[in-house]
């Protein structure tokens, strides 16, 4: 993860790419003391260009890296676009997300729910899986990515 920082107090345009976690002393050494703005990013989430507390940005990126235990980083932008106004908003509500790994449809989610339930096997074969999947899709909030399905529960 990298960000391109510029010093807004410098009269000449000066900027540099920094790898997260950002070393604040290195930023000051390279760009000089001042006020820094994020002018470009290479991040697995969307971040508007602008002023950010660099220590907070380090913490956000650390949390995002920890998501890899929970869901793929490559899906973060899609999740963010669907449900959240910013990465900060996503972090505040990450516990509302359910990740259905290796599912590529609501039908597969329905199968998982039924398989993980306490229904007797002979009853499971009589369920209309397509109808159950349609009901899930109508009543719940899902996002289907290339590799997974996510659900937001409020």
Q: Where are the regions a protein language model picked out?
A:
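A short, compositionally biased
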Residues: 1, 32, 137-138
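Short, extreme N-terminal segment that most often corresponds to the first beta-strand
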Residues: 1-26, 148-154
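Acidic, proline/glycine-rich low-complexity IDRs
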Residues: 6, 111-154
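Alpha-helical structural elements
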Residues: 12, 78, 94-95, 127, ...
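Structured domain cores in non-transmembrane regions
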Residues: 24-89
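Short, Lys/Arg-enriched charge-dense amphipathic segments
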Residues: 58-65, 95-100, 144-148
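Extracytoplasmic/secretory-pathway segments with low complexity and glycosylation-like composition
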Residues: 80-117, 122, 153
């Amino acid at each position: 993860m990298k960000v391109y920082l510029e010093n807004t107090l410098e009269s000449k345009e000066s900027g540099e790419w920094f790898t997260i976690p950002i070393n604040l002393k290195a930023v000051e050494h390279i760009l000089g003391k001042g006020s820094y703005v994020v002018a470009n990013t290479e991040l697995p989430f969307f971040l508007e260009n602008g002023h950010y507390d660099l220590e907070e940005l380090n913490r956000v990126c650390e949390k995002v890296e920890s998501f890899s235990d929970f869901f793929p980083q490559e899906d973060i932008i899609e999740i963010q676009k669907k449900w959240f106004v910013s990465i900060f908003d996503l972090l505040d509500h990450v516990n509302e997300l359910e990740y259905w790994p290796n599912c590529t449809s609501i039908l597969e989610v329905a199968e998982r729910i039924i398989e993980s339930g306490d229904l007797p096997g002979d009853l499971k074969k009589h369920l209309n899986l397509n109808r159950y999947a349609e009901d899930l899709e109508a009543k719940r909030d899902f996002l289907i990515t290339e590799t997974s399905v996510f659900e937001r529960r409020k």
